[in-house]
Amino acid sequence: YKRQSKLAARAKERAALEKDPRPYGGLAAEASLVAMQEFVPSAFAKLDVKGCDKNVYVATVLPGASAALIRDTEFGGDAFVGLQVQSHTHNPGRDLAFALNWVKNNEPGATLESTAADGSEPKLEELIDASATLDVQVHQDFDWWIPEGAQVTPQIAQSLRAANDSVIESHQVGENITGAAFWANAGGGKAHIRWVRPNDDESAFLNALARVAARGELNLGEGTKFAGVFRTHGLIAPVFDLDPEVDHASYEEHLTRVDKALEEEISNDAQLSADERKQLENIKSRQVTLR
């Protein structure tokens, strides 16, 4: 019996050390969650949590980069769970499940500092509906941190000012595309669109990017350039450089065109031509792994 419990404890330790290749895989909200965790400064989205009677919102970042908070009853008692947190494990999907489970079982006024999952959390799919999508509300400041009518202490006001000063203008783009794309202007004379586009076959997706690039169509119109890809949370996110003076809403048509071209090429299993191979090497040389 002793040996069995030792083996079980060891197996549990091993499981905790393993990294989930796609922490949000299997969820319709996968791309939105990844984008909010990695690319979007200030945003939140309502998330229905099974068996929870509170309004729950998943957010990019909360005051102090804390994991979760439940507002006092006098301010509505809504709960917020942060994705960009100070304290976490290498498995963001389990961390989110841990924080959502905490929200479910705690009272208004409570705050969770660390989101680090400890193995006590249920599976994410047991807490949220896998087919639910997120309606992401992007903000250009963090004023939503403060509930209406709440007292703002000088300390809170100062931290809010600092947070607001750090916000990069961002907007969601691409109404009808696969995944989630966000435009951002970080300054330096260039704006970007980062497009989290889930695909189950990584090499087929990279080949599709190469084929579309070889045709000269991997761009979002005049004055734009394909910059490379980010790898994060088991997904590939193409990035485009843009003119910051051009309105973010003007890329809809081009995003839809590129999305359609990629979708058609993903199922193309013919050998790559010499030019397509060259494009593939170029794409691979411009990839940055975030986590």
State the predicted function of each range.
Residues 223-291:
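Alpha-helical oligomerization segments
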Residues 180-182, 193, 228:
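Intrinsically disordered, Ser/Thr/Pro-rich regulatory regions of eukaryotic transcription factors
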Residues 1:
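Conserved small/polar residues in nucleotide/adenosyl-binding loops
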Residues 73-189:
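Internal, hydrophobic cores of structured domains that mediate oligomerization or house catalytic pockets
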Residues 13-71, 132-160:
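Short Lys/Arg-enriched alpha/beta "domain-start" segment
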Residues 4:
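Arg/Lys-rich, low-complexity, intrinsically disordered N-terminal tails that contact nucleic acids
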Residues 195-200, 240-244:
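Short beta-strand-to-loop capping motifs
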Residues 199-231:
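Short, internal acidic amphipathic alpha-helical interface segments
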